[in-house]
Amino acid sequence: MGGVFELFGEGQRFLQFSNLRAGNESDEGNAATKLDLTLATGNNSTLFDNLAGEDRTLQSARSAINLLTFQCFAPGGRIGVAKRNGKETAGKGSSNHAPCTPSSMVHTLMLGQNLLETIHQNLLTRESVTDSYGPNGWGIPAWELPVEKREDKTAVENSTLTHLGRLVPLSRAIRLNDGGFSIILANGLEYPIFPAFREATATVIKRKGELAILSASTNRSLWRQLAAVSVRRQADADATSGPLALNRLRPSAETNIWVGALVTDKAKIEDVVESTYSLPAGMFSEFGRASYERGVAYAEELEGGLIQSVKTYASALKVTSPAYNRARQQFWTRVEQHLSALFDLARNTDLAADLPNCPWGKAVQAAAFDAYDQSCPHQTPRQIEAYALGLRKLTFRPKNQQPTPLAHE
């Protein structure tokens, strides 16, 4: 059993396929740095990697981390064809996303005081796994039932359709050479994605009446989606929920979380987004989440008013390219400096009854005025007149309604 955690040597290896050979004898393989998504290989940018053209040998510890990360997050696209047990690997040169990448899915982890506590907080109970994946969803680690050939249905299903099997995926057929500087790389196992299988760290929401995975994007900050992330899964109820590990928590105080995603456009990695937050206990109650969501919606409403103001200003001056992007960036940058006031809405839901006059509402209004002021010059008489016209759009009318629970709960 100990050999399955070795990076090199004959036989079974850690997150690598045994009996894997290059597709043809002249194939020199890929650089091992291709497994490191932070380095310049393939479609990855060279912006932060000045050694892209040189042969590099990675330390074994880093290679192990790279293997696990790549098997979880490798984007789909064209890939090499290798031979295993004399047969070509699947896909005919194509590959799908690794299991943690589809839809740029948002992943959430509970954070403890140290690594051991963090691991413990993210473990799932058998009850939770059975509720989410069915009576056969627990499985066994992939190294205890290795996939020796594609036709081995039992081993393939264990690796791709069970909780323990998917924790160490084999989405790519990889074999490190003994020097650690090159690899054989081809398509591996196919991992069903949502709705056939949901990742334990993902969040399920309702979008246009249908269940979907919560996605990240580069133009929408993660804090704007925390109301969905903080929903606990209810057995025999609606499947919308945040990460399954939330079921084990009974928060009476702050809960620290890490939220992140690999943002992709087809086979291209666009960016990595991540943040850490300390969620008040109110975020795990219906009314607390509803208040928080109303606060986010209020900011988005004011963003819309800001854009209309910039449009009015630009129209008056006959500007062909209004400064929409600049205004948005200025607005959200200022808003994010006041997130503590937004979390206060979950702590004290009474504040959401009068959003424009609570600290969060006032901070958002000030951010909108500041962003408009910075994006629309007002020095000449014509500019001042246009500025005044746009300023009239920045009106904030209180909406006196009590917070209600989220519709997707």
Per-segment meaning from a language model:
Residues M1-G42, T69-E409:
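Extended alpha-helical scaffolding segments
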Residues L47-D49:
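Beta-strand elements of modular eukaryotic interaction domains
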Residues L51-E54:
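Flanking scaffold residues of small Cys/His-coordinated metal-binding clusters
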Residues Q59-R62:
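Short Cys/His-rich metal-coordination motifs, predominantly Zn2+-binding knuckles/fingers
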Residues A64-L67:
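Short functional micro-motifs and their immediate structural scaffolds
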